[in-house]
């Protein structure tokens, strides 16, 4: 095994261990707050959420690499598979400079919309991947893990929004996933094409979420001094 592969596995394992501590009050007790309304410091909350978002991105990237290996030489398949992601309907900023121009509370709601939009598609993806006989155990386990961790990420982002910008809660817009209907009863090629594109979109969106959260931490917690 090459050193790059070893490093990747080591980092993934570390993120898995650390993610189990996220939002765990037993491992990280929340500070005692007046009136019993306890909240952890915003910086710590950002740190935990970003650790989890990066973990999800790494899992989705690894899952896409596993799928891509199967079709790397089939250029016709890849050309057919790649289509617009349903979340493209969300007007998310392209690049750091554009994201810097978006008010923090608006960007947080966009992040929340992206993460929330994946809840049902991830549930479908787990079922679809689990039904593929040739799917590796690694792909199946990653799909299940991402589905579970996405719920926790959603919870963490909602906590950040509620603590930093409570007046902005409820302004998120969720995309409609009509392009990804159930794959039950479709032929094998159509199923594989749809799953490939769904995982590709998952990797793209999880990378966006991870980058946006890191940018927001710098702006909100460190006043752009990072």
UniProtKB/Swiss-Prot annotation:
Location comes to: Secreted
Keyword Cell membrane carried by entry: no
Residues annotated with Phosphoserine modification: 53, 117
GO BP term (any one): positive regulation of cell population proliferation
Q: Can you list the disulfide-bonded cysteine pairs?
A: 33-38, 85-201, 218-226
Task: Report the family membership.
Answer: Belongs to the somatotropin/prolactin family.
Q: Name one GO cellular component term.
A: extracellular space
**Subunit note:** Interacts with PRLR.
Q: Where is the signal peptide?
A: 1-29
- PROSITE patterns referenced in this protein's UniProt entry, alphabetically: SOMATOTROPIN_1, SOMATOTROPIN_2
Q: Show the SUPFAM superfamilies listed in the entry.
A: 4-helical cytokines
Q: CDD domains from the entry?
A: prolactin_like
The answer to whether keyword Signal applies is yes
Kindly list the GO molecular function terms attached to this UniProt entry: hormone activity; prolactin receptor binding
**Listed name of the protein:** Prolactin
Q: Which UniProt keywords apply?
A: Disulfide bond, Hormone, Lactation, Phosphoprotein, Secreted, Signal
- Chain's role: Prolactin acts primarily on the mammary gland by promoting lactation.
- Name where it mostly resides: secreted
